[in-house]
Amino acid sequence: MPHEKLMIARLLLEELKVDRVEVASARVSEGEFDAVKMICDWAARRNLLPRVEVLGFVDGHTSVDWIHATGCRVINLLCKGSLKHCTYQLKKTPEEHIEDILSVVDYANEQDMVVNVYLEDWSNGMKDSPEYVFRLMDALEQTNIRRYMLPDTLGVLNPLQVIEFMRKMVKRYPHAHFDFHAHNDYDLAVSNVLAAVLSGCKGLHTTINGLGERAGNAPQVIEFMRKMVKRYPHAHF
C-alpha cells in the first residue's frame, strides 16, 4: 500500500538517518507509481528528495519518463555487469549495450536527473569476463554518472574475492564512487560488506534485518556501521 511505503520511507530517512533509499522499480504498477509519488511529495517538502531513488532499466525513455513523472530525480539504472548477462540475457554485443546505456544517461541528464548505475552480476563479470567490466567502465566513466553500484548478484563471492575485485576497481578508477551490493546466499553478506569497506568502497547497500531480494541482503546494523565510519570516513550507508 502507498501509505505503508511512505511510513517506511519516513522511518528510514527521518528517524534512522539512512543516507539513501531505493523505494521502487519503474513501470511496475499504478500502485507503485502512486507510492513513489507520495514519497517524493513528502520528501520534497522536507528537502530530502535527493535521497530518494528508483530502480530503472535500459529501455530508451520509458523508465526515465516514469520516474520523472513521480517527482523522483534519481534513477538507479540497471546495466549488465557481466558478458554472460549481456550476451545471453540481452542478446546484444557489448558495443550495443554500451550505446543503449549512454542514450538513457543522456536523456536522464536532459531531464535534470541524477544517474547511478548498477553493474548487475558484477561479481561473475570480474571472475569470468573482467575485460568486459573494464570496457563498460571505461565508457561510462566519461559521463557524469554519480555512483557505480557493484552487485554480487548471485551471492557467490567470499571476502577475499571482494577485497581482490574491489581493489582492482578502485585502483583502475580512483575517482569513481563505488557502492557494494551484497547478497546473502551463503551467509557471507556481512563479512563481504566489511571487506568492501576495507578495500575502498564508499557505499553499502543494506536492508532492515536482512530482509530483501531473494536470499536477502546485508542486515542494516546502524550503530555498528556508524562506528565503522569513524575508522573509514570515506564510506556511506
Identify the function of each model-found stretch.
Residues F33-R45, M126-T143, M166-V170:
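Short, electropositive alpha-helical surface patch
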Residues M1-G60, I222-K227:
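N-terminal capping/small domains of soluble enzymes
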